[in-house]
UniProtKB/Swiss-Prot annotation:
It comes from Rhizorhabdus wittichii (strain DSM 6014 / CCUG 31198 / JCM 15750 / NBRC 105917 / EY 4224 / RW1) (Sphingomonas wittichii). Belongs to the GroES chaperonin family. The lineage of its organism: Bacteria, Pseudomonadati, Pseudomonadota, Alphaproteobacteria, Sphingomonadales. The keyword Hydrolase does not apply. Pfam families: Cpn10 (PF00166). GO terms for biological process: chaperone cofactor-dependent protein refolding. It comes from the Bacteria. Keywords: Chaperone, Cytoplasm. SMART domains: Cpn10. It is found in: Cytoplasm. This is Co-chaperonin GroES.
Length: 95
């Protein structure tokens, strides 16, 4: 199934959480927090102003991003867990 977000929405794949701490302690699944870093998979066409002009999004597919802990809606597309969020939920682009 192909999916393209609408307007100012962004489809994001979370990066995997670290399995170990820097000191070598293995973190059990129950203690892991959801990662707040991801990769943009697809973007919508942009937000529409009152005058009808469309403003393109600042992020593009392939960008590594940081987002808020509670940002986005979890969805499953082609068996993969992804997030759909507004561009305003994105804190910044990494790198």
């Amino acid at each position: 199934m192909s999916f393209r977000p609408l307007h100012d929405r962004v489809l994001v794949r979370r990066v995997e959480a670290e399995e170990k701490t820097a000191g070598g302690i293995i973190i059990p699944d129950s203690a892991k927090e959801k990662p707040q870093e991801g990769e943009v998979v697809a973007v919508g066409g942009g937000s529409k102003a009152e005058d009808g002009k469309v403003t393109p999004l600042d992020v593009k597919a392939g960008d590594k991003i940081l987002f808020g802990k509670w940002s986005g809606t979890e969805v499953k597309i082609n068996g993969e867990d992804l997030l759909i969020m507004k561009e305003s939920d994105i804190l910044g682009i990494v790198g």
